[in-house]
């Protein structure tokens, strides 16, 4: 059974939030070829690998490009002042392009809700985006679990109810997006309360956050890295809200998405990422962006069932 004290064994200390602010765009952006920064290109293992390149599907080899959908989720993926995509996802994408000898073309498709349809419609070969893996998502697409994410609590700015932990949410109104990892986390936690939480299921995350801003809900839970960054900088989805950085709840995965009828691309990407893990390139990228504690040691796919709450 889920415990309130389920936390990351390695504390997410040293998170670096000296990043440029960005705002998620509603409109789809133009495709950008991911060109690695010099520091990424020099990382160990970031070099053309013939064996991995040979394992690509013929369709990718023919066009010499992988079309990737993403969305803006700082600090994982965002745009700098010049409009260039930067962050963990951009660096990983650029490194994959070098290793596989193809152009990786990333397009910001706007809201996170557009990510799954981007793959199912076959407009894109895959996504590289900080989307939470769960068993329901895995029924639609294959999910490559490429990093962990913790979850934290968000309240209205100032935290007038003095919420400090999940126990403090017992008996409170807690808004969650329908059918998500966060919803299952809250429901599991509420089952341990003497007075259950009043769980408010709301279709979209922006409306969940608005419910907290307006006082309809007392709190919500959301991804740790994004919540802390946007609230500390009072930018984007974090405006008017406060995250609790000392609260690091059950770990889940963030995943890349690939259509289920494309196992050859999935397996090539998994092998390429594992190559980056073992060479040291992947952990170096995670450390560069201050998220080293969220790095995986083994790249798996469709592994949500192994998480504490799924």
Enumerate the predicted regions with their spans:
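Extracytoplasmic small-molecule ligand-binding "clamshell" domains
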Residues: 29-129
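A ligand-binding cleft/hinge motif common to bilobed small-molecule-binding domains
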Residues: 113, 130-138, 185-189, 218-250
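Alpha-to-beta junction loops
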Residues: 102-103, 120-129, 172-173, 213-226
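Short helix-initiation/N-cap motifs at beta->coil->alpha
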Residues: 105-117, 161, 199-214, 250
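Ligand-binding cleft/hinge of the Venus flytrap
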Residues: 80, 93-103, 182-201, 232-236
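Periplasmic-binding protein-like
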Residues: 148-155, 234-271, 292-310
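Ligand-binding clefts/hinges and TM-proximal coupling segments of bilobed small-molecule sensing domains
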Residues: 33-50, 181-199, 239-240, 273-310
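Flexible hinge/capping segments at coil-to-helix
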Residues: 156-174
């Amino acid at each position: 059974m889920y415990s309130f004290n389920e936390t990351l064994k390695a504390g997410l200390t040293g998170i670096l939030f000296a990043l440029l602010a960005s705002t998620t765009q509603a409109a789809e952006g133009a495709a950008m070829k991911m060109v690695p920064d010099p520091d990424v290109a020099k990382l160990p293992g970031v070099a053309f690998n013939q064996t991995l390149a040979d394992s690509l599907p013929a369709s990718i080899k023919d066009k010499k490009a992988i079309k990737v959908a993403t969305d803006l989720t700082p600090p994982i993926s965002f745009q700098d002042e010049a409009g260039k995509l930067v962050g963990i996802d951009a660096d990983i994408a650029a490194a994959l392009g070098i290793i596989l000898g193809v152009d990786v073309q990333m397009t910001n498709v706007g809201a996170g809700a557009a990510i799954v349809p981007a793959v199912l419609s076959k407009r894109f070969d895959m996504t590289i985006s900080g989307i939470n893996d769960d068993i329901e998502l895995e029924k639609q697409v294959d999910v490559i679990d490429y990093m962990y994410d913790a979850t934290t609590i968000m309240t209205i700015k100032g935290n007038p109810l003095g919420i400090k932990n999940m126990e403090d949410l017992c008996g409170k109104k807690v808004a969650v997006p329908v059918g998500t990892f966060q919803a299952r986390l809250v429901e599991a936690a509420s089952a341990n309360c003497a007075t259950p939480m009043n769980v408010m299921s709301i279709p979209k995350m922006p409306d969940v956050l608005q419910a907290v801003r307006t006082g309809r809900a007392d709190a919500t839970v959301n991804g740790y890295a994004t919540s802390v960054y946007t609230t500390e900088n009072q930018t984007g989805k974090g405006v008017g809200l406060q995250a609790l950085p000392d609260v690091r709840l059950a770990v889940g995965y963030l995943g890349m998405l690939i259509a289920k009828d494309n196992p050859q691309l999935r397996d090539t990407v998994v092998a390429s990422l594992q190559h980056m893990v073992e060479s040291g390139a992947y952990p170096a990228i995670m450390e560069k962006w201050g998220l080293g504690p969220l790095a995986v040691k083994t790249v798996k796919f469709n592994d949500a069932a192994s998480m504490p709450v799924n």
